[in-house]
């Protein structure tokens, strides 16, 4: 087999019969598979050892040669080569066909490639191939022309003869009639009898005339057909064809079936045809030109690729190796076989029968029928079911043909090439491991032993516990005591990868250092659950083992969980306290009025109470039980930095230094909390709501190295769990309090509802108005019950604590639990006007329960649909962006996009832009940011982090120009400077980073949170699409539902208000032609927007509009935006629209991810005029290629091609990629492969997918060429230290991160002192 690292591109083409025979090791002549008695392959059959190789290593069929020493000998008795049995996976055979057949892909695909090449309609082609019509393959024009007059004379003679015969017959009959009539006259017969005789005579004469006329017409038809005879002409009438052959056989040749197609292709002159088509395209119009363009695509493909079109008609069929279509014996003595064997058997049977019929000289009709059946059997083998009814096996199941083996999720591409299974892996249920450090996981001993088996065995031999590998293996299998010690040693410093399906983004696989644990469950650190989206209700996770040194290094440096604290989508920390931890820290930092040991100032006769000289003293007081951690005290601090304002006041310009004392009015809990934060972090004197905790960790991630952040979140986790236990927050029925005012509130609203009902019955309201009124009333009622609930609950109620701390849940859930459920929706998504008045605490009535089930069931169905849709969206996004990789440091472009930082109010104050986090943050500045005085605040090329943005806002700068991937000029991929900071690391993105895939994951991962439904927006007639369908609509560049017109020009609006429609006319400012939009439905309503005077109101007559402005409510069509405003605007429009959907759901994704995808959608140019280039008009060309080709042509003095940018949906863009491997593994596999083969496409292997498919390292990350060539050798010290168990003291974590024991630590054993 050839090594994947020795080639740089992969080409696909058409195989000729010669190629097929060259690959083959012999011809398969018999349909037999294996002998049912001996179970050995039959000679010359589909499993023949002589052709495909021996079934057993180094052993021939007859058993004469058995052993390696005869390697390479071909046995003279049975003809089998002595070699490995594995060659049966790679040796092919072939079947020599008795008659040529066409390849169904090229004839039946849409468009029919054969039809386009030969200029035959697919229907006609089918008639020819399946023996329903003859086709003329060649005509000897010259000979026909020369002898036409002679032939015409002959024809005239023949016609004359027919006419003469007719006249003679008529004459004779007329005379007979006369005689008969005379005879009757003489006999005196009645007039009646005479009339009968006359009628019959005349009828016979009419018949004679008709017969002669038919004969003359036939001759006329034959003659006309012959004079107009041309190649590729179809003759469906068999008699006519026979006559032509009998009379003029030497002037033309004709045939039916694939043979005729083969002859036509042989006589086909590709170059002349291409020239003629180009001529038609230059001068033609309309349909003719379109047809010529389509045909030229196929003809030019053959012309340029040098493929021979003869490859579309096969003289021999290859037989794939037998191990790839195996036959296995089942226990019952029956055999299971691959469908391909059945399909091959049909081909061989029919082929052999055809050979026999031809040898016997059977009549043509029988031979043709057999040829047709052979054609059909080869079609079924290549693509069963493509034409006619599929061939079925037992139980009416269609057989799987070669095409079916490639297609779809279960096909070769997606199942075996992109989704390989890997060795050294295991999976188990996960449980929480609160005692672990952030970079650790608990690995069950048995699983670890199995995973690390080879390492353990080698180490046992090294340490002389075992003599050889075999005995070491036995020791491991019997689990001898010394095995465990060796295992401890082997796993030290060897990271493992944990993965939880579905892996929606890159944090779904992270590396951890394993700790051996008892039991069979993997222990997972609680802080990484967010990234994995894991919980402990029975989730399972898979473990994988990186083997090579490089793999271990990558796992440790790039994938260790403590290095992956930030989300790649938004750049904000994911590893932060949640659930119990939040509650614990919230409890710890709460200040309770009048709690034990509270600070009281000195009075006349009492000293000051609650003042402490140090945190240690306060802890001592707490330990003695005289001070509560939540009581307000005064404490003197020396090791904690005061907040900024106090620091400025107390310590002035020099600032605080460790050891400087200051007094804090706070609680002991808050002091303990602040001691967890890194040294030098300003004191936080607040109650720790989840949001505050998040902002602190955010801040840490911006200011401190990752390792400090990892230590801090770990300390917060420990403290959180400890204090959550201490707080005693539990939920019981007694905690669910129903507000006493509930009944009176509901009675009040019931009265209002009664009134509305009465009005409805009197006819004052119609049905819809009544429903709307009731919905309003009950919404108010629900809110009021919620309000009463809020007031009734005490502050220390556990349920309220959980909600208020931000740990989980929200107030709506509390209201449902204890107040009332409120309004629910029906299956259509409308509110049912009767509310559910009960809370879950009181219990629902039967009717309430029933109406509540609608919404609940719809929710479940919706979630299932959403998950599938969202997964498919992610798959398309990955496919379109998979080859976007950071290729260089800086493309040096001057271009960029302008982002808003703030809005200036009329009074001159700045209001920070709410979306600054996802637009300007983490970008590279494109030009110097200068304030009014001309001072450079931030220089070009700087990274915009939080401090820089604050500096810009302080200087009063409202917008800046930043670099963006939309304007990057790198050819393939993007440059690091245009991309900016990598969200996951907080530093400039590395070269080799696969930013395309990260972008696709960042957009796809929250896809499941988006809603499915389209929602009504304030009485707009058309639904406005939102949620996931809207995101798909945007990325697929579809014309939106409820499309809104946009202004083509800048000018004044003239609005005409009709009965059902608006008509808008724009009078352009530059005096060009007016633009008219009529028939604008009134249901869509006019757009509200900001006017020049700053007011917001609906578009009205006389308003001034800018180019590209939307005129009606709804969504603009991106293709229109592209046409009117150009590529840059449409990119920004798409980014903005996608962000709106995600923001509505509260999902934070950085703009740069969406920009990467949108950039891929606008990569191509459609050619309008080809100039002197090779491009065909109407074809889609990559922009970089288009510009390069134009530069080349202009340099040579030719005409450049003209093109216009085109917006492609992501599916279309994926299929239009230059890599045929990537496109074929995405969708429409057979179509892509057909196309690629005709064009002789070459895959440069630039993207990730194609390299995964052929098994090379991907050209991203450490697989990119500039890193691949680095050589690494371990030093002697490293070799020596390879097996000593290190402690974490000296390297990874600070001293208070001791070695974890792997045993669960009872929380009660923790003293307070651990929190210092």
From Swiss-Prot:
It comes from the Bacteria. Zn(2+) 1 binds at residues 60, 62, 75, 78. Zn(2+) 2 binds at residues 891, 968, 975, 978. It catalyses: RNA(n) + a ribonucleoside 5'-triphosphate = RNA(n+1) + diphosphate. Its EC number is 2.7.7.6. GO terms for biological process: DNA-templated transcription. The keyword Zinc applies. Binds 1 Mg(2+) ion per subunit. Pfam families: RNA_pol_Rpb1_1, RNA_pol_Rpb1_2, RNA_pol_Rpb1_3, RNA_pol_Rpb1_4, RNA_pol_Rpb1_5. GO terms for cellular component: DNA-directed RNA polymerase complex. Mg(2+) binds at residues 535, 537, 539. GO terms for molecular function: DNA binding; DNA-directed RNA polymerase activity; magnesium ion binding; zinc ion binding. Gene3D superfamilies: 1.10.132.30, 1.10.150.390, 1.10.1790.20, 1.10.40.90, 2.40.40.20, 2.40.50.100, RNA polymerase II, clamp domain, RNA polymerase Rpb1, domain 3. Keywords: DNA-directed RNA polymerase, Magnesium, Metal-binding, Nucleotidyltransferase, Transcription, Transferase, Zinc. NCBIfam families: PRK14906.1, rpoC_TIGR. The RNAP catalytic core consists of 2 alpha, 1 beta, 1 beta' and 1 omega subunit. When a sigma factor is associated with the core the holoenzyme is formed, which can initiate transcription. This is DNA-directed RNA polymerase subunit beta'.
């Amino acid at each position: 087999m050839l090594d994947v690292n020795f080639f740089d591109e992969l080409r696909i083409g058409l195989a000729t019969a010669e190629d097929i025979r060259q690959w083959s090791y012999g011809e398969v002549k018999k349909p037999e598979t294996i002998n049912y008695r001996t179970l050995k392959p039959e000679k010359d059959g589909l499993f023949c050892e002589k052709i495909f190789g021996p079934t057993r290593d180094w052993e021939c069929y007859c058993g004469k040669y058995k052993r390696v020493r005869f390697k390479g000998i071909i046995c003279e008795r049975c003809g089998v080569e002595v070699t490995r049995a594995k060659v049966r996976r790679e040796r092919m055979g072939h079947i020599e066909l008795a008659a040529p057949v066409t390849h169904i892909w090229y004839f039946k695909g849409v468009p029919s490639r054969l039809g386009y090449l030969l200029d035959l309609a697919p229907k006609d082609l089918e008639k020819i191939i399946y023996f329903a019509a003859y086709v003329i393959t060649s005509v000897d024009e010259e000979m026909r022309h020369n002898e036409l007059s002679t032939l015409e004379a002959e024809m005239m003679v023949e016609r004359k003869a027919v006419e003469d015969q007719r006249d003679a017959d008529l004459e004779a009959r007329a005379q007979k009639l006369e005689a008969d009539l005379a005879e009757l006259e003489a006999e005196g017969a009645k007039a009646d009898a005479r009339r009968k005789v006359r009628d019959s005579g005349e009828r016979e004469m009419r018949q004679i005339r008709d017969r002669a006329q038919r004969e003359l017409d036939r001759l006329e038809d034959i003659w006309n057909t012959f004079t107009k005879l041309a190649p590729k002409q179809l003759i469906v009438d068999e008699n006519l064809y026979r006559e032509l052959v009998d009379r003029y056989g030497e002037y033309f040749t004709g045939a039916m079936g694939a043979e005729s197609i083969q002859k036509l292709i042989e006589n086909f002159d590709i170059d002349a045809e291409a020239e003629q088509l180009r001529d038609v395209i230059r001068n033609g119009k309309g349909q003719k030109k379109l047809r010529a363009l389509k045909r030229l695509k196929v003809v030019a493909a053959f012309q340029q690729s040098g493929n021979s079109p003869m490859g579309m008609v096969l003289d021999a069929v290859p037989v794939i190796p037998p191990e790839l279509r195996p036959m296995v014996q089942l226990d019952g003595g029956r055999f299971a076989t691959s469908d391909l064997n059945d399909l091959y058997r049909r081909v061989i049977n029919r082929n052999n029968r055809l050979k026999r019929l031809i040898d016997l000289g059977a009549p043509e009709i029988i031979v043709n029928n057999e040829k047709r059946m052979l054609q059909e059997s080869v079609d079924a083998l290549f693509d069963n079911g493509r034409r006619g009814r599929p061939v079925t096996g037992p139980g009416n199941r269609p057989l799987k043909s070669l095409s079916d083996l490639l297609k779809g999720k279960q096909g070769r591409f997606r199942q075996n090439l992109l989704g390989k299974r890997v060795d050294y892996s295991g999976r188990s249920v996960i449980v929480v491991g609160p005692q672990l450090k952030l970079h650790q996981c608990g690995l069950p001993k048995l699983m670890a032993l199995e995973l690390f088996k080879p390492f353990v065995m080698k180490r046992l031999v090294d340490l002389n516990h075992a003599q050889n590998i075999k005995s070491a293996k036995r020791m491991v299998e019997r689990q001898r005591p010394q095995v465990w010690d060796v295992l401890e040693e082997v796993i030290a410093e060897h990271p493992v990868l944990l993965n939880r399906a579905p892996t929606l983004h890159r944090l779904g696989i992270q590396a951890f250092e394993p700790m051996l644990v008892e039991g069979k469950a993997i222990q997972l650190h609680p802080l990484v659950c967010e990234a994995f989206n894991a919980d402990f209700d029975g989730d399972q996770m898979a473990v994988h083992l990186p083997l090579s040194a490089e793999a271990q290094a990558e796992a440790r440096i790039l994938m260790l969980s403590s290095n992956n604290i930030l989300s790649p989508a938004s750049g904000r920390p994911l590893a932060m306290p949640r659930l119990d931890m939040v509650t614990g820290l919230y409890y710890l930092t709460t200040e309770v009025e009048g709690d034990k040991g509270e600070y009281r100032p000195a009075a006349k006769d009492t000293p000051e109470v609650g003042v402490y000289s140090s945190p240690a003293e306060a802890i001592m007081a707490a330990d003695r039980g005289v001070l509560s951690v939540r009581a307000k005290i005064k404490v003197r601090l020396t090791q904690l930095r005061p907040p900024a304002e106090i620091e400025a006041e107390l310590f002035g310009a020099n600032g605080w230094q460790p050891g400087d004392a200051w007094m804090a009015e706070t609680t002991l809990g808050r002091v303990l909390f602040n001691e967890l934060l890194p040294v030098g972090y300003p004191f936080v004197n607040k109650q720790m709501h989840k949001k505050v905790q998040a902002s602190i960790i955010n801040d840490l991630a911006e200011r401190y190295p990752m390792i400090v952040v990892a230590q801090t979140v770990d300390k917060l986790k420990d403290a959180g769990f400890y204090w959550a236990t201490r707080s005693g927050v539990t939920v019981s029925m007694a905690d669910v309090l129903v507000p006493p005012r509930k009944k009176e509130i509901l009675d009040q609203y019931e009265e209002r509802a009664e009134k509305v009902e009465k009005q409805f019955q009197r006819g004052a309201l119609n049905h819809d108005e009544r429903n709307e009124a009731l919905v309003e009333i009950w919404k108010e009622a629900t809110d009021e019950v919620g309000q009463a609930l809020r007031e009734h609950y005490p502050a220390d109620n556990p349920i309220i604590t959980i909600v208020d701390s931000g740990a989980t849940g929200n107030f709506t859930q509390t209201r449902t639990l204890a107040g009332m459920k409120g309004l629910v929706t029906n299956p259509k998504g409308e509110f049912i006007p009767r509310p559910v008045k009960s809370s879950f605490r009181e219990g629902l009535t039967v009717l309430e329960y029933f109406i509540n089930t609608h919404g609940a069931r719809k929710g479940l169905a919706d979630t299932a649909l959403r998950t599938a849709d969202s997964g498919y969206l992610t798959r398309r996004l990955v496919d379109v962006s998979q080859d976007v990789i950071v290729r260089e440091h800086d493309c040096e472009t001057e271009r960029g996009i302008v982002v808003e930082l703030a809005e200036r109010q009329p009074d001159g104050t700045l209001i920070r832009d709410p979306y600054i986090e996802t637009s300007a943050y983490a970008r590279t500045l494109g030009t110097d940011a200068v304030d009014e005085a001309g001072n450079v605040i931030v220089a070009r090329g700087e990274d915009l982090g939080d401090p820089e943005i604050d500096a810009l806002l302080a200087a009063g700068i409202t917008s800046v120009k930043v670099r963006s991937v939309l304007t990057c000029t790198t050819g393939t991929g993007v440059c690091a400077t245009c991309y900016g900071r990598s969200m996951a690391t907080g530093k400039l993105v590395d070269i080799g980073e696969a930013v395309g895939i990260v972008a696709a994951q960042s957009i796809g991962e929250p896809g499941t949170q988006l809603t499915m439904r389209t929602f009504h927006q304030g009485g707009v007639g058309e639904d406005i699409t939102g949620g996931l369908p809207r995101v798909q609509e945007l990325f697929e560049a579809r014309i939106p539902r409820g499309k809104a017109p946009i202004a083509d020009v800048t000018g004044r609006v003239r609005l005409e208000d009709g009965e059902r429609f608006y008509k808008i006319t724009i009078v352009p400012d530059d005096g060009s032609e007016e633009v008219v939009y009529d028939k604008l439905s009134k249901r869509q309503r006019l757009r509200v927007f900001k006017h020049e005077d700053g007011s917001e109101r609906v578009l009205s007559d006389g308003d001034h509009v800018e180019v590209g402005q939307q005129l009606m409510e709804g969504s603009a069509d991106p293709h229109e935006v592209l046409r009117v405003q150009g590529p840059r605007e449409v990119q920004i429009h798409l980014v903005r629209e996608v962000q709106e959907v995600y923001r509505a759901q509260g999902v934070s994704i950085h703009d740069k991810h969406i920009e990467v995808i949108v950039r891929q959608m606008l990569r191509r140019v459609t050619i309008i005029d080809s100039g002197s280039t090779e491009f065909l008009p109407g074809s889609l060309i990559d922009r970089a290629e288009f510009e390069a080709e134009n530069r080349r042509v202009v340099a040579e003095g030719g005409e450049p091609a003209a093109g216009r940018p085109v917006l492609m949906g992501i599916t279309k863009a994926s299929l239009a990629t230059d890599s045929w491997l990537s496109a074929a593994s995405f969708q429409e596999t057979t179509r892509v492969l057909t196309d690629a083969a005709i064009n002789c496409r070459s895959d440069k292997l630039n993207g990730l997918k194609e390299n995964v498919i052929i098994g090379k390292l991907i050209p991203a990350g450490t697989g990119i060429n500039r890193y691949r060539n680095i050589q690494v050798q371990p030093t002697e010290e490293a070799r020596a230290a390879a097996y000593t168990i290190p402690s974490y003291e000296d390297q990874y974590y600070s001293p208070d991160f001791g070695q974890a024991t792997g045993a669960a630590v009872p929380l009660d054993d923790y003293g307070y002192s651990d929190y210092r």
